[in-house]
Amino acid sequence: MDHLPLDLIDNILFRLDPISVIVMQCTNKFLRTYISDPKFDSYRFSLVGSSLFYISRHAPFYVTCQENIIRSYPCYILGSCSGLLLLDIGGCFFVANPFTNRSRPLDHSGSNILYDIVTCVNKAMCVGFAVDRIQNQTKKRFKIVCIVEMQMMYGFEISNGHSWRLSETTITSSSKSDLAKRTKPVYLEGTLHWLRNDGSIIAFNPETEQACFIPSVFHQEPETELFFASDDKINRLALVSGTKEEISVYTLAENAKWALARQIKNVFMEQCELEFWSLVMYDGKRLVVREKKRNLEGVFHVYDMEANNWGVLGSTFWSSKGVTDFYKLTPSLSFVEEDEVKDNIPCYDPQASYLTATLVENGV
């Protein structure tokens, strides 16, 4: 097969389901190298793009961190990175790739703080999930980092999927400000970043265990929505602030100051019909806003940063404003060591069976 034209190989591989593509890697060295190239993932999923998910049989294209009431086991998403999800299902934790139906159970018994975090909605932002590709392999390694907030000092508990330990690294900020509630950490260039209420940032590198305090300042105006993200086009942290009329995008400059990069007129929303709205996602290419009208399902509006226009991304059945923890998921064929294909998950493990059912139910 390695003697075939590359466009023909692509045509064959793109017609296969994700599991079959993974199996094809085992047939010869050429295919293993070809499929392992990160560019293959990018090209294969270029027409699919990134998505938002929530676990619901009614709306399979979005995922939220809120409890899934469809089944007996509550399901939460704690993180999303490089095509993998960190899931809490009935108190059991998994790293899963919903596009390949592969997953790996995690032992969390050694953690001293994870349970306290996941049982409190306002502490969900304390969990960081970092995924990196192992060089020259399709496998990825991951680390889970729980940040411990102690007045002006911060500590870090780390897991590589096998064990938990408290890092020797601590950092003390120069000012008192709490971590921004319900604001997910951003993983950028090997470092996890946690936003604080005053606009400053706690940064931690899971690999080197080095931490630093970024003394940036941002004063949030009343009646504004705030969203912490990264601009993938320029590899910089971004802060999106918006009202019903206008949305402003700021990027973190090298001098540790938030610089205004873009101002956008918000999508038109009828005030008399509007129940609530929120910022959902930003990646430098797209900005997603959720609008909920009274007695109607919610609508996701997407703004194309290059075309400078609004469009409709989809709808959601969620009616509560509290359901705001959406996660961007970029399709990938990669997997982590010791994960399992769904058919190999023991049927006697109810949480694992539930995970399998959830992934299948969501059309992946």
Annotate each language-model stretch with its function.
Residues 1-364:
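Short, conserved recognition motifs on repeat-domain binding surfaces
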